[in-house]
């Protein structure tokens, strides 16, 4: 226990300092002065504000020893005398602080004595004699214990440091004055080390407020309202960190009202009533009261109702701030008395401006100069996600982390320095590390963010946007949403928005729910995403949901007629006697369901419609195919439109050739018609077998008529080469999708074995298109060739020149009186190919093949017992 004396406090303090300096106490390893009664850190004296006051008071009283002539002042004991042990003051033992390495005990004594000199010099400015005595005593003690005289060195170092510190103070003071003039929240700045940086950065003027341009700039009425001295009751609603509390404090400070602030987290009905009572008393003196309630949504219904009478009577002006939707969390009666202003989260540009301002004022607020590059600033603004408090707290943590890296000695020097030491801290994106990681997404179960996210997911699925669907699902899962809730909502989507358009959607959603239930997070994420994307890509139909709502509305407006008798169940004999189930037609007993004539609705509403299936949106796959097809057709149309109207010279030549071929076709048709008419006249009196041949000739005539009609259509559109080619192919019964060789039936006109008598009459051919030399007594015909030579009755050679046009050969679809076994050979190697003509009982053929075009005509007649017709097959 320490000993107590009756001397006054000033004497105790001064004697304490004298005792510590004269007894040559030793500084231990932890940096403390030790004696028998106490352990005390000499650097902690300045932390005690009461000790400061006592020290200064004692310094003023010490002037008695300097020949003070004031007789009314009581005599004080001489503080320079060596105190007795009874004058020692004992202090409670202080907790040990982190240690730092001491050079040696002798130097420690010197440093401690020098520190005592500095303390006495700073605190006893009015008593120079006492300071000199103390310095002498300290120096004597140092010499006696260590034999070292550091007085000269200490004085020199102190002088140099004071000069440097004075220059630093001048520069810092000038910078501080500029900052205080620039920002209103620094005007009455008082450094509070315990306040977080975000609180110290809170603006006090609307000119310094960042963000909410739509509210403060876009709406001038609201801005004037906030700046006016007369305020209504209003609620500020917005996400965290957007400036609700700051704006409310700025607006309240501009009015002439008393301001009372409460937080709904730690207050209740009692606190509200106390504020209302005080406001009622001040109102009697003509001054109103503003009650600001932060997080007002935390109040329950009863607590909110307490505010209603005071607001309605004008006793208080309520300003509330909330992060939850007021329409859900606040009473309707309270909302009717307060205007709600919705605030948006800060933009990335707003946060970058705020971060740069924070970097500018931190030298004044925290004795640190933060230096950040643009990349780090943009990354921090991105991670903050509209929350100003998050951005400033990251900077605050970076500064505090830098302080932890300092040694104990550096912290003590900085703490007790009056020079305003400012240290530079360079912060890069890499150095901040995990501080730039997003800790959480905006998500509050049961709040606005929760319902907004699930609404966005549902509408993305309905709109068949798989990309957006995946984003919202993953964001909800990463925000901490219950996965079972998400799949329950997807079950609803499968029946509401997809329905009958894809009957596998609902079973898949139920399977996803079971998978989540069995597996759990995080393994179930793939199952949830798979189901969500499938629902987004599926076809859509809301027929079930639409007609359910329609029928429900109908039932609310109309009475319900009874169930028809034939549809009622009759499990008992009595009910059967009543006629229940009579005349019911069991559908499975009818093979033809059209025989079922019963109706299934009551008679009054049998014509009402209560369901009709409608496909509102096809699947993504079907739409993609349709879009591709539409795109291809549009490209073809564009190509046709972009083609020049004037054709090139090769195209014009091709068109002229086609027109010539059409003219040749007309001439060939005339020849065929004449030959057919002659054959009909000759065969009119022949046998029944020949009559069948006559019928076939009539069919040929019909085909020729069709060819003539087609040619007439071609003549009307002879300017379009593509259409002409198409009609020519159609007239020759050609299909480009089929193989090249097509068959056209043309029976032989004459039978060489049985009808030799008629050869001389029929072998007359019409006027040839081009002259050809043909030498044979049974064949006198001309086709579009330059030279045809028939050697004998068994074989003939047909030679074509190089300028032979194979398109014209298609017109010679009928060659009469070809001898049996005759061969037709083409001499041109590049264009033709030789084939033998074989004669059988039912078929004769002539084949002429070209590398560019293959035109084939053939015919097979039914066998006739007496005189079967001999078909001729022309293969081109």
From Swiss-Prot:
An individual GO BP term: DNA-templated DNA replication
Gene3D superfamilies per record: 1.10.8.60, 1.20.272.10, DNA polymerase III clamp loader subunits, C-terminal domain, P-loop containing nucleotide triphosphate hydrolases
Name of a matching Pfam family: AAA_assoc_2
Binding annotation for ATP: 240-246
InterPro entries: AAA+_ATPase, AAA_assoc_2, AAA_ATPase_RarA/MGS1/WRNIP1, ATPase_AAA_core, DNA_pol3_clamp-load_cplx_C, MgsA_C, P-loop_NTPase
SUPFAM superfamilies noted in UniProt: P-loop containing nucleoside triphosphate hydrolases, post-AAA+ oligomerization domain-like
MF terms (GO), sorted A to Z: ATP binding; ATP hydrolysis activity; DNA binding; enzyme activator activity; metal ion binding; single-stranded DNA helicase activity
Reaction catalyzed: ATP + H2O = ADP + phosphate + H(+)
Record's compositionally biased regions (Basic and acidic residues): 850-863
Plastid is among the record's keywords: no
Compositional bias per record (Polar residues), positions renumbered to this chain: 835-849
EC number: 3.6.1.-
Superkingdom assignment: Eukaryota
Entry's localization field: Nucleus
Root EC class: hydrolase
GO cellular component: nucleus
Keywords: ATP-binding, DNA damage, DNA replication, Hydrolase, Metal-binding, Nucleotide-binding, Nucleus, Phosphoprotein
Entry function: Functions as a modulator for initiation or reinitiation events during DNA polymerase delta-mediated DNA synthesis. Has an intrinsic ATPase activity that functions as a sensor of DNA damage or of arrested replication forks and regulates the extent of DNA synthesis.
Family: Belongs to the AAA ATPase family. RarA/MGS1/WRNIP1 subfamily.
Name of protein: ATPase WRNIP1
Lineage: Eukaryota, Amoebozoa, Evosea, Eumycetozoa, Dictyostelia
């Amino acid at each position: 226990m320490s000993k107590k004396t009756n001397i006054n406090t000033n004497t105790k303090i001064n004697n304490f300092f004298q005792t510590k300096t004269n007894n040559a106490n030793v500084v231990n390893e932890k940096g403390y002065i030790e004696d028998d009664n106490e352990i005390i850190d000499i650097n902690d004296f300045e932390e005690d504000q009461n000790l400061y006051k006592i020290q200064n008071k004692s310094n003023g009283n010490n002037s008695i020893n300097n020949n003070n002539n004031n007789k009314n002042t009581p005599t004080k004991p001489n503080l320079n005398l060596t105190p007795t042990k009874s004058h020692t003051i004992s202090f409670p033992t202080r907790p040990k602080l982190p240690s730092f390495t001491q050079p040696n005990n002798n130097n420690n004594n010197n440093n401690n004595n020098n520190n005592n000199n500095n303390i006495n010099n700073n605190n006893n400015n009015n008593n120079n004699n006492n300071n000199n005595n103390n310095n002498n005593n300290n120096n004597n003690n140092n010499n006696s214990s260590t034999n070292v005289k550091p007085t000269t060195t200490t004085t020199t170092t102190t002088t140099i440091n004071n000069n440097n510190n004075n220059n630093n103070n001048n520069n810092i003071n000038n910078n501080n004055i500029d900052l205080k003039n620039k920002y209103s929240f620094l005007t009455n700045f008082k450094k509070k080390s315990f306040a977080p940086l975000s609180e110290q950065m809170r603006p006090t003027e609307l000119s310094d407020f960042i963000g909410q341009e739509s509210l403060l700039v876009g709406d001038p009425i609201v801005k004037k309202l906030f700046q006016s001295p007369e305020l209504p009751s209003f609620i500020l609603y917005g996400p965290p960190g957007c400036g609700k509390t700051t704006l409310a404090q700025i607006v309240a400070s501009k009015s002439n009202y008393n301001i009372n602030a409460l937080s709904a987290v730690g207050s209740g009905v009692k606190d509200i009533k106390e504020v209302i009572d005080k406001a009622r008393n001040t109102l009697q003196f003509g001054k109103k009261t503003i009650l600001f309630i932060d997080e007002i949504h935390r109040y329950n219904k009863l607590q909110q109702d307490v505010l209603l009478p005071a607001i309605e009577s004008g006793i208080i002006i309520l300003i509330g701030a909330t992060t939850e939707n007021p329409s859900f969390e606040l009473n309707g009666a309270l909302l009717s008395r307060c205007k709600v202003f919705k605030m948006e989260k800060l933009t990335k540009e707003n946060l970058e401006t705020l971060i740069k301002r924070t970097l500018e004022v931190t030298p004044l607020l925290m004795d640190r100069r933060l230096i950040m590059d643009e990349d780090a600033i943009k990354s921090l603004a991105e991670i903050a996600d509209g929350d100003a408090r998050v951005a400033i707290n990251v900077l605050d943590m970076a500064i505090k982390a830098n302080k932890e890296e300092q040694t104990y000695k550096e912290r003590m020097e900085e703490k007790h320095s009056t020079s305003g030491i400012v240290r530079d801290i360079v912060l890069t994106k890499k150095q901040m590390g995990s501080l730039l990681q997003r800790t959480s997404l905006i998500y509050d179960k049961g709040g606005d963010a929760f319902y907004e996210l699930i609404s966005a997911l549902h509408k993305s699925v309905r709109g068949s946007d798989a990309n957006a669907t995946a984003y919202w699902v993953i964001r909800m899962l990463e925000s901490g949403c219950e996965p079972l809730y998400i799949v329950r909502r997807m079950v609803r989507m499968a029946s509401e928005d997809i329905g009958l358009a894809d009957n596998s959607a609902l079973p898949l959603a139920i399977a996803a729910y079971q998978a989540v239930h069995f597996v759990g997070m995080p393994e179930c994420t793939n199952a949830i995403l798979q189901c969500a994307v499938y629902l987004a890509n599926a076809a859509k139909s809301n027929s079930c949901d639409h007609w359910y709502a329609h029928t429900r509305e109908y039932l609310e407006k109309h009475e319900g007629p009874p169930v028809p008798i034939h549809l009622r169940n009759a499990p008992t004999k009595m009910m059967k006697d009543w006629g229940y189930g009579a005349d019911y037609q069991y559908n499975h007993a009818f093979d033809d369901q059209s025989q079922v004539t019963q109706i299934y609705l009551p008679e009054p509403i049998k014509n009402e419609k209560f369901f009709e299936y409608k496909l509102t949106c096809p699947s993504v796959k079907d739409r993609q195919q349709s879009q591709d097809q539409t795109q291809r057709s549009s490209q073809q149309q564009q190509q046709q439109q972009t083609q020049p109207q004037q054709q090139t010279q090769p195209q014009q030549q091709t068109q002229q050739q086609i027109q010539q071929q059409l003219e040749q076709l007309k001439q060939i048709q005339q020849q065929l018609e004449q030959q057919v008419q002659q054959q009909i006249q000759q065969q009119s009196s022949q046998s029944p077998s020949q009559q069948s041949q006559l019928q076939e000739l009539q069919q040929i005539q019909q085909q020729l008529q069709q060819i003539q009609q087609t040619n007439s259509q071609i003549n009307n559109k002879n300017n379009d080469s593509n259409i002409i080619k198409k009609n020519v192919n159609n007239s020759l019964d050609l299909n480009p999708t089929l193989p090249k060789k097509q068959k056209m039936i043309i029976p032989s006109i004459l039978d060489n074995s049985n009808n030799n008598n008629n050869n001389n009459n029929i072998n007359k051919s019409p006027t040839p298109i081009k002259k050809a030399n043909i030498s044979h007594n049974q064949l006198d015909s001309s086709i579009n060739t330059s030279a045809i030579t028939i050697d004998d009755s068994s074989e003939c050679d047909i030679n074509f020149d190089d300028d032979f046009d194979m398109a014209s050969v298609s017109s010679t679809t009928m060659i009469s009186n070809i001898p049996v076994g005759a061969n037709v050979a083409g001499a041109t190697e590049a264009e033709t190919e030789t084939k033998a003509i074989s004669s059988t009982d039912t078929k004769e053929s002539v084949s002429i093949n070209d590398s560019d075009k293959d035109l084939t005509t053939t015919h097979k007649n039914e066998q006739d017992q007496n005189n079967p017709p001999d078909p001729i097959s022309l293969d081109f």
